[in-house]
Amino acid sequence: MIKCEKKGVTVKETVASRVINEISIRLPSLSVNESVARSVCASFCAQLDPTATEIADVKCAVSEAVTNAIVHGYRDEIGIIYINVRVYEERVVRIDIRDKGRGIEDVKRARQPLFTTDAENERSGMGFTVMESFCDTVKVSSRVGRGTSVTLIKRFSAR
């Protein structure tokens, strides 16, 4: 079941709300691949004929999630970032971004605006807040030493 919590809309994965297309990619955690992930996800969403603003929203949210995996999940090592994008009949997209990196010790605290484990970087601490502002639902699960999974759900407007 997919729930767009901000707008109170629930979409169940049934015949009426089935996945109409899906893509999975794996990328090394190199900073150059942040733009690749952003472009692939936005291009895949184009089949729903979204507005330019909706595409920009997807790009920003994906960029933040992938950057978190690169910078915080893997830090100074190279690992794999797993991305799965599902498009549903009801003009809903679900993007799962997963790493097998360091994990987050306290997810609730990490989701607070301006919280960062990288105090030297003045632009840190807003990633989850940015994702939440551009998506209907953002889910985060993590285990220290096992990695983090971020699910972004966005409903596109009717055209």
Show the residue positions of the predicted features.
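Conserved beta-strand-loop-beta-strand hairpin that lines the nucleotide-binding pocket
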Residues: 1-24, 69-159
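A generic structural signal for short
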Residues: 29-30, 54, 116
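STAS-typified acidic loop motif
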Residues: 24-36
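Conserved polar catalytic motif of the HATPase_c/GHKL fold
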Residues: 64-68
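Conserved short strand/loop->alpha-helix "switch" segment adjacent to the catalytic nucleotide/phosphoryl-transfer site
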Residues: 35-63
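A short, mixed-charge helix-start or loop-turn motif at secondary-structure junctions
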Residues: 22-27, 48-51
